[in-house]
Amino acid sequence: VIAGGTDVASARFLSPRQARDLPRARIACYPSSTIGTRYPDPFHLGSHSYGFNPWEHNGIVYTCRGGHIDISHLRKACDWTAYLAWHIRQALLSDKATFSYRMREPSKHYLQFEYPQGWASLPPDVRERIAADIAIQVAAYCTYMGMVWHEILTWFGYKAVAFYTEYPSAFSWEDVYSNLLGCRLAVEALRDPDRDFDEALTARIDEELQRLGVQPKPAAWQAGQAVRGQWFVGDFLFCDIVKRNFDIGWDDGFVTPWIVPGTGGCSDASPAIYAVPSLSALREYGFSVKYEIEPREWERKEILSILYPPGRGQTRRIEPAQHFGAIMQYVRAQAIHRYGTYVDDPTLPSPVAPQLAVVKPAGTETAVAQSPVATGASLGMQSQAAREETRSGRYGYEGVEPASGGAGRGQKLTTNDVLTFAYFWLGEEP
């Protein structure tokens, strides 16, 4: 039986021309107060653009309820959600059983669909509506998991650019929350019946930052400086994040941002806790989707060895809902070995950093349970009290490769990528 669901008949997807191109590259930066970190005016971030736009500003901003937010990460998550939503909708309307794609790493992502009985006989307008709703939900889920996968890869040493490792910033304290926020805002923008994706997203980013209590430009640097020697050490090429945020929502389906206490203008505001995307809502339509990742990076051997016996896992796939928990436990154990027991606790000093003032608790308590990522939690903001009620314990360089049901072609830099890198090196931000 096919029933229910949000009416998304008027949803505004990317245009076919936009969807031909991969989401463009954007330069991210550390949240730390180090050389190279860009701080845009959070009240004038410019218009979001799926394609190249010299008036779009990115960098680190600080919010009272969301802590540091990387606008580049947020925008990338938005664009990947929109890109995947367009292609997944096309696959569903073509009755394809499988769909595959690549993000910004060699890994290949697979989706396997099971359709409900009677799907082929539904009126075209009903199929369109259901396909649109499912595509948006699945795209947000896959984008979020793909972004987490990128953090996992960089933790194990993956380099998107030769000789430049992203390990120092893997699971830095703002990464996951920024990605999650982007997925959420993309869902809302895609469902906007009156504006195209770029226009709707421009408005939603500004509105959400205001709701999170975004602070003037200097506050982002000041908040980073406040945790120098506690959450990070060093500077520029020698910066190391000694506090890592491994909260991907595996324990309870929610992600809590790290808040820097005492930041001017915030008055000890409580963190805005968000639910991670899930696939649970597909059941109301009678659909099911299996999502897998096939690692193709050099680092795959070590990652797969966590899940499979030696010599047996080199061609295996990873199912995030089933395997990310074990991988994250392994990553956390490595982090504890390298940085100390409290590596993921922002309230206590790191033993490998200078012993400065201790950052006080700010609602970032941690608790180990089966992941609701598998069982599902709907997109939505929850209060601290609501989250406590659900807690039961603690705890994405390339192109899109065509395959069965796949989209895109080749591993290459797009014109948008070249323009983005050139503009950055010419000086995007003052």
Give each language-model segment a name.
Residues 2, 146, 170, 390-393, ...:
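A subset of signal/propeptide-processing and intrinsically disordered low-complexity segments
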Residues 2-168, 187-362, 367-369, 379, ...:
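Bulky hydrophobic segments
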Residues 151, 175, 181:
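Divalent metal-coordination and catalytic microenvironments
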Residues 168-174:
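A glycine-rich, coil/turn loop motif that links secondary-structure elements
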Residues 358-429:
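Long, low-complexity repeat tracts used as extracellular stalks/passenger repeats
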